[in-house]
């Protein structure tokens, strides 16, 4: 194998199977300083300035002025190039620019999120028969097809290829073994059928989809999922597979990629409506009437993505056992992404949260909003700290450096009431002017204010932010008509994926939902909040963590404000009890407790990984492949291979020529052998 390349080899031996600002004493710039102390400080400041003048370097003044955010393209440029190398891979993704919008880029994002990084990409215009013959399976994004392209796909299937098409045009209906009907369903449900092998292991409840689904009548196809209402099934298929010639053709009656985007990112129509009152727009309000609160405990978008990955593996089962990457590091069943907003809180309050997280071997993200001081005020606070090192009223650069050295993230928490870009520029300048830079790559906006459908994400990506945690479960819209409060996956997901805009363009920033929010559970900031006792709030949080660990497989976002620890008293006691209960639940169920920044590093390495040279040798009964991560990391990931393939069973795995043990764990109807390996090239 190539030097330094990770090369797992699977040998299959033949055997028949049977938030408000926290006001502290620091808000008064002078505090209880005496006139004498002030004059002493002023004199010291003069000496500092004079010294700086001698050396020609006004270091303090220059640093307190702060920086403006760098600007770049917010988009994932040339997203298909990383997978355009058409060397051996089992899956070819054909993106169709005729979709409304084109969703090929987001369909590729789904494959990566599912760990099926063994794919290559081409545009529909580049479709050629000789190219298709290299791939046992073709995945086609939604959009119209001309006659020539349609005939190329027909011949590919007839000669033994497998095709999965997202909402193809009706003139291909016979290829998929269905007959088109005139009606459609908009924003409905599907039910995955346990009776079909592909449907085994999925939730029995009907699942929401968003977008338009075409109605068909079965005409020889096998039904994998059915259109439904909340109350019961409709007489129309949602997902089918049909044996045609020597191959197979599977149909999705709606655009799965766009449905997942809509489910995760909310209703674009509400974004347009709320845009008339931008100050009142908040990310969670995009989900008013959009999510079925009776289904919120199920990650509905994730389950439908898993249905696609299960279908792909099933359709390839006569060609090769398909490897994949597990969702989380070192085989963990989920993650707790631990974060907390802080509003000018003192360092000892920050330590209260960090200490509790560190006691459980975790890391934490603090999103900090300093007061919007001007340069002179920032210089005063920096100087005051220099004069009085014991002062603990304001977070200083030394605190930030020490926290980061301990593995925590100390990031920006911008106020954007004055306008999205104006707020970002101002808070970037203040944050760096206080000596807190560099600005880390993850963020949560104050009050989770949101612009447009994805405008906030677009601006953040432009400034180099790579993960957003603004999608935040809070408010009365999560209360059912009977008064019960709903908690769970309000975006339909527990997985990070990049945002996509209205034109189908992929943004260079991940959406990580925040599922567990102190404001919603112990209710200390907004009128009408549930205000559960800490024990009840822990019980609710623990139930979500348990579901994540036992089959929902999600990265649970946590918001635990720092402010209550600065307020003290009952607020601090309740916050401490709830936070400790959540952290203990994560430990009990095996969820690592990571900061958002650390989690982002893993996500980018995993999502950017590529399986290369995937080859099945039927004579030797061996599967060989290489895995190239986007970047080496000091973490582990898990690579899974089916335990059974045709009449064979996995008996031995080697990595870089050395035997390695594996553990067995099922994933939606398939039993896998999983090996944990360092993320390296």
Where in this protein do the model-derived segments appear?
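Helical hinge/lid and interdomain linker segments adjacent to catalytic or ligand-binding clefts
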Residues: 93-175
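A glycine-rich, often tryptophan-bearing local segment used as a flexible ligand/cofactor-contacting loop or short
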Residues: 144-214, 218-219
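Active-site-adjacent pocket scaffolds in enzyme catalytic domains
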Residues: 184-202, 206-218, 233-244, 255, ...
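Catalytic grooves of carbohydrate-active enzymes
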Residues: 294-298, 320-323, 340, 500-598
